């Protein structure tokens, strides 16, 4: 990556933009986002060079790269974009990615995004934003392929070809009647069927879905359990309102695991990345638990002081104290690691507190 950074830096300074364009056009969007992160404020001191590189990307690749960037870079670029460039990014972006961007941006940036959105896009954005932050509705997309049960396989393929280019996924299609979800069918099922077969005869009617207000952590658990590529989201009347895709579910799982690690390490969860969190925020996330641990250490010291006479009589006992305390700390670290792993794999829940305590305090038949 560093060699690529240096090469692009050199070519831009030499104004060999065509060569730069040929280099970046074949790169993966996620890799380009990492590249821009390295460039942001480091290799390029000039904002114009940063913008030149972004403008050399093809429109579709630029939009996908933009979606992978962190909020600081996105805000920086939007403030430098013309209205046409914002419009181009929105045209190539999925609605759920646009919503993610809006949620991270300051008010002045949000107003520019909404100003350059179409009426349909604003309606879709507002529809997702009205759901609670940690709900399934807040992470779904409304860009899915909907089929009718009376369609034939050939008609279904015709519709997929017609509307699929603007959908986030076309592998899993959803069969609806009066907006109500009645079946699910995959492209594989369609390929394996005859052209004249009816969708109603080959669709899967045993549907696993999630309510719009369900906690997004539950959505992550369902993806982990059922290996979904996409999960339908329905309202209380079983009307299909959107889908959660695999990439968004993975973000939820990563956030959940980060939160679990923070809690087990006695640190208040923080949504910002490590290097984008200031020293005062780092201190704020730790100070409460540090005070609690300090109080517990004080209690330990009080107990130790009560046996001061014993230590005076047998000084050798003092030499064992650091060893015993370190061993206890190491044992606690090992136990917390196992607990974190169990939580991450959904083997342990907070309701299992007493069950875990019993496991550590009593012998098990499995030990024999």
Task: State what each model feature region is.
Residues 87, 123, 133, 200, ...:
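Alpha-helical membrane and juxtamembrane elements of multi-pass inner-membrane transport
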Residues 248-282, 333-358:
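Non-transmembrane, extramembrane segments of multi-pass ion/lipid transporters
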Residues 360-368:
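Single conserved hydrophobic/aromatic residue that forms the stacking wall/gate
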Residues 131, 148, 207, 211, ...:
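Juxtamembrane loop-helix boundary motifs flanking transmembrane segments in multi-pass membrane proteins
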Residues 280-344:
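Core alpha-helical transmembrane segments of integral membrane proteins
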Residues 1-268:
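Hydrophobic packing positions in regular secondary-structure scaffolds
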């Amino acid at each position: 990556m560093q060699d690529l950074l240096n090469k692009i830096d050199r070519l831009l300074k030499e104004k060999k933009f065509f060569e730069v364009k040929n280099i970046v056009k074949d790169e993966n969007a996620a890799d380009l986002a990492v590249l821009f992160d390295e460039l942001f404020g480091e290799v390029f001191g000039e904002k114009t060079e940063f913008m030149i590189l972004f403008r050399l990307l093809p429109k579709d690749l630029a939009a996908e790269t933009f979606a992978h960037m962190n909020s600081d870079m996105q805000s920086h670029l939007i403030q430098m974009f013309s209205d046409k460039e914002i419009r181009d990014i929105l045209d190539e972006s999925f609605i759920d990615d646009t919503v993610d961007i809006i949620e991270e941006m300051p008010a002045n940036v949000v107003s520019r995004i909404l100003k350059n959105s179409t009426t349909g896009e604003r309606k879709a954005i507002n529809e997702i934003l009205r759901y609670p932050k940690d709900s399934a509705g807040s992470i779904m997309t409304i860009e899915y392929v909907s089929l009718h049960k009376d369609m034939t396989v050939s008609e279904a393929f015709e519709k997929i070809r017609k509307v699929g280019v603007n959908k986030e996924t076309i592998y899993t299609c959803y069969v609806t009647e009066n907006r109500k979800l009645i079946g699910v069918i995959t492209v594989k099922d369609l390929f394996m069927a005859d052209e004249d077969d009816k969708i109603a005869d080959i669709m899967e009617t045993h549907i696993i879905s999630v309510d719009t207000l369900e906690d997004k952590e539950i959505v992550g658990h369902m993806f982990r359990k059922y290996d979904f590529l996409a999960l339908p989201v329905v309202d209380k009347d079983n009307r299909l309102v959107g889908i959660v895709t695999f990439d968004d579910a993975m973000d939820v799982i990563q956030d959940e695991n980060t939160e679990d690690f923070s809690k087990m390490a006695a640190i208040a969860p923080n949504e910002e990345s490590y290097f984008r969190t200031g020293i005062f925020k780092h201190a704020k996330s730790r100070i409460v638990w540090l005070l609690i641990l300090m109080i517990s250490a004080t209690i330990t010291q009080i107990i130790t002081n009560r046996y001061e006479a014993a230590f005076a009589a047998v000084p050798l006992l003092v030499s064992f104290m650091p060893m015993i305390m370190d061993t206890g700390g190491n044992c606690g670290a090992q136990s917390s690691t196992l607990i974190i792993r169990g939580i991450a794999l959904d083997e342990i829940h907070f309701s299992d507190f007493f069950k875990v305590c019993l496991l550590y305090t009593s012998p098990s038949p499995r030990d024999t």
